């Protein structure tokens, strides 16, 4: 930018050198031996699909579906080389779907209580099995997933899968339960709304009724199906996954799921012992000891069995869906038992209420939580043009004591794609935000598959609307398919811009994995520069990261119409 004084870069170095003062520096724990983690979330059934038909509500035969086996040695090596330490395989567990697998002893699901044709991965139907869609041979689907775990480990990465303790599919049916394990609800007393050891809550005296559809919606887009009759047999009706107590949930409720009972009474009272306040500062072993010998609700035991089962199968970490809807005492019970047996397990939770962050970290023994409500929302507003970078220092200050636990991301399966018109409108505009998101804290970085090649999520898959890649239907992901290039996984069909974008991500993520400074101290220099540097404004953000051995100045320009120069001579001089 013409006429701008670039002295702020030299000031940044000077400030960094003088940052011994406790009043001026936001200190983080010195974790220099550890390095940043990078989690690559992949929607498993979409990853290897190279079919380009993309028919709304299309079947797996029409639109295609990816398989576990598509993650071959070459594909996994390319993901690892992108700068990835962990893969979160989303949609692995057997969930409700419309596709017919009765030939394999699996009951059909009712389209009236399934979102999309392929189904939501968060409406789990059988916790001890995997999605038959993902197997070349559905009869051997567990063996194929176990082989994928092994291939992933051989490429130097760890495996994360989802556990969804808050709810299950409306038509839960455990066909693969280990010996001694009973289905959810199998022993419930359905004559009462609530009982501690019931797995579900009930709407006494009322049958379940399918929601009244809105805005022209109908299951499967109106296609005829023998089970799509506007009814689903459930008597008495159960509470819905998001907590709705209506026998006829709204279309915007999580009507395809049923809420799990964790011993929380309908009036909010608890039928389990609460943790003493001082347990917020006690380690997982103390928590594990606390729960030994105590009676806990049946649902606690069921989900503990599930989590331990998958960790024994070789999974390295668990991502807990909607964790804040489950009492923190359960997380203390579960996670302390996990850490006692699998101390290296990575435990990531979806929590959106900032008032709960510290309890779920300290009492619930979570390793990481989503940093959405503050960091993601703020930086998205900046990218969209109406947020100011002035807000970011405050956001970081608010989580200073827990910043290492706050996972950063710009995309995931719930959020809009960066190039979509409702976010940035282009992948290029996301670059400054990605730099800040990846480098501002010691927390892990999450990247959603095809983010690195600028996927806009523009397809109409059926259920839901574009801007997000569908998690409900069979669909192709065009930019990702160009990277797959006929399953060569070499990026051979990418455009020049897509290749450049992927190289940007590869450089940034690998740097973050290897940088000592990114696990060291942080200080914002934004306000210092804004007060003293002509031309520096609310569209620029700057901060420093350092350890004794490595010092970084990080500056991001969010204004696509203005450019700034850096004098490396001055930088070297300092």
Where are these regions (language model features)?
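C-terminal motif of bacterial Sec signal peptides marking the signal peptidase cleavage site
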Residues: 17-18
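N-terminal structural segment of carbohydrate-active enzymes
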Residues: 24-158, 166-168, 172-176, 188-189, ...
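Conserved, mostly hydrophobic/aromatic
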Residues: 42, 89, 127, 162, ...
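Loop/helix patches that line or flank the sugar-binding groove of alpha-linked glycan CAZymes
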Residues: 97, 400-403, 409-412, 417-572
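Substrate-binding cleft/loops of secretory-pathway carbohydrate-active enzymes
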Residues: 169-170, 175-178, 331, 352-381, ...
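Active-site region of glycoside hydrolase catalytic domains
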Residues: 169-281, 400-404, 434-446
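Active-site neighborhood of glycoside hydrolase catalytic domains
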Residues: 279-355
